[in-house]
Amino acid sequence: MINIVTFPGLGLEFSLNRVAFHLFGRPIFWYGIIIASGMLLAVYLCSRWAPRFGIVPDHILDMMFFAVPAALVAVRAYYVIFNLDLYRRGDGSLDWGAILRYSDGGLAIYGAIISSVIVLLIFCKVRKVSFLSFADLGVHGLFIGQLIGRWGNFMNVEAFGSTTTLPWRMCGTSIAEHLLQSGYVDQAGYEAVLSGALGVHPTFFYESMWNLAGLFLVY
């Protein structure tokens, strides 16, 4: 499915396809590629910077061996827990098929942050390394991952904010439909978004830039 996203005040238009390519008949999404790219860059740079924090670079890869699987479960679990009604059948029981269907979307970075802290605490305890030093280094990785990863939200046309008429407002049919279905705009507002007169805050971009600023501050 192609989503057309425009920034009327900036004269920009993007044609976005969530699917990058197909592999063995299965779609490979840009979101996953971008998230994985952010994670790999974070691991690479943190490995380079590790000696500054008194951390052995190999410890980062060892920790990631446990942190990544835990995060894959936690990002979905966090989203499901806080949106449980979306995964209930008509009789009130949980639809485990829908819960386990990652391809339908529904992930929350907060779950990965929580699980990573827990894994890091256990890892540092077992390996007898400083949790605070590792956490200081980990913050750099978090900023890098989020800086890049938020562009996955752009490819999915999600994680946008409230309505606005600012020059950098973001517009699109899928955005207008979401706002109308969620009750954030009425029919007039829906048509205004379609026309480009009204848009939404590109919060994915805001957060990406905040993480870039955060990385400069802690580096």
Predicted regions: what they are:
Residues 1-219:
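A feature for loop-to-transmembrane-helix boundaries and adjacent hydrophobic helices
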